[in-house]
Amino acid sequence: MCSSDLLIEEIKRQTTASRREAFRQRGEKLAAAHTAAFKRTRQEAANGWDASPVSTARLSMELWAQLKSEDWSYVTGWVNWPMRLWDFTKHYQYIGRAGGEGVGYHAPASIGAALANRKDGRISVSIQPDGDLMVAPGALWTAARHQIPILIVMQNNRAYHQEVMWFQREALARGRSVELTHHGFGLGNPDIDFAKMAASMGVGSSGPITDPKDLAAAIKRGIAVVKRGEPYLIDVVTQPR
């Protein structure tokens, strides 16, 4: 028995019956609050369920529907809907956020994590921001060259949208129009076809997907490829957030 186990046992021994009852009651309250919060989140996620471009909530839910029965690892730092809708129960299911919040982190980090997961046969999955991938697109070639199994699902909102939102907030705070906030941060004209980009580097791909009804089949196909030990990218054109 290690020292931490001994410490835990001693804490249990010294915990009184009244304290254990207090812990139980607090646990019940927290469980009820969690259940209520999850119910609210599911209701929020239903907004724009059939919208095109695809809602980011539906993208996360469609992924979860097929991942929850697998041994999976979420290997990127984008966490909004996954953290609210997925059931994270193991330490390896989330690798954490980028420490400095720098753009260009997600693709190299997720492929590196997928390499680490390869020996365990886990399904590594990444929801990949489009602007972030444009900083280091060569990471796709690395995944193909070294046969790193990873499912990369693009959140393709056709902009460096973190920056767009920042300037929208700044414009509104100063009473100015937000019409010009996409200038310098848009990724359209021409639109980027990430499926073709991936294919050009040897990565299997689907998309661009604009109809959410096409997601399930593409995800199923992608998981099958990853189980064969290969990378796969699904280009999903999404709502901004």
Predicted regions and their residues:
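Short coil/turn segments at secondary-structure boundaries
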Residues: 20-25, 75-78, 235
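Glycine-rich, acidic loop regions that bind phosphate or pyrophosphate groups
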Residues: 1-29
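Thiamine diphosphate
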Residues: 4-5, 82-240
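A short, charged, Gly/Pro-tolerant segment at domain boundaries
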Residues: 24-36, 236-241
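Structural signal for hydrophobic packing residues in well-ordered secondary-structure cores
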Residues: 7-15, 34, 38, 42, ...
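Active-site diphosphate/adenylate-binding microenvironment
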Residues: 28-117
